[in-house]
Amino acid sequence: MFAVVRVRGSAGVRRDIADTMEMLRLNRINHAVLVEDTPSYLGMLQKAKDYITWGEVDQETLTAMIRKRGRLIGGDRITDEYINEKTAYGSVDEFAAAVFSGEVKLEEAGIKPVFRLHPPRKGYEGIKKAFNEGGSLGYRGEKINDLLKRMI
């Protein structure tokens, strides 16, 4: 499972790339979504690589994102009581483990699919270069977890 974060804004974006970002639900800077590792999603990520960054999220970071930044439809925070009542899981930690393994999706539990994050502490490395060139854009593998922890 990939975590995808929008790094750059919408000014001057080609129409087809803007449509791809809309399909990924990345409408604003510092918004993050979770996507499966499928060929169709990988193609979308490659198309928008000059405006986003992505990598494999780990379970600890995913749990922290759901607990601190996840919101219910209507804007309320996610609580253990809500998860216990609306799903078959007893706590947010168990639910996050199920999301990580692919057993359940966020939308099935009434949770918004987009995480609105803070800008990263200490800033981005640079929003015009690829990650492997010392910037912030494109694929970054496991290092996405470091970025997400700075943004939660």
UniProtKB/Swiss-Prot annotation:
Pfam families: Ribosomal_L30
Listed GO CC annotations: cytosolic large ribosomal subunit
InterPro entries, per database record: Ribo_uL30_ferredoxin-like_sf, Ribosomal_uL30, Ribosomal_uL30_arc, Ribosomal_uL30_CS, Ribosomal_uL30_euk_arc, Ribosomal_uL30_ferredoxin-like
Any GO molecular function: structural constituent of ribosome
Keyword Ribosomal protein: yes
Transmembrane segments: none
The UniProt record lists the keyword Ribosomal protein: yes
Tree of life domain: Archaea
Keywords noted in UniProt: Ribonucleoprotein, Ribosomal protein
Cystine bridges: none
GO biological process: maturation of LSU-rRNA from tricistronic rRNA transcript (SSU-rRNA, 5.8S rRNA, LSU-rRNA); translation
Alphabetized PANTHER family for the sequence: 60S RIBOSOMAL PROTEIN L7, LARGE RIBOSOMAL SUBUNIT PROTEIN UL30
Name by which UniProt lists this protein: Large ribosomal subunit protein uL30
Provenance organism: Methanothermobacter thermautotrophicus (strain ATCC 29096 / DSM 1053 / JCM 10044 / NBRC 100330 / Delta H)
Lineage: Archaea, Methanobacteriati, Methanobacteriota, Methanomada group, Methanobacteria
Protein encoded by which gene: rpl30
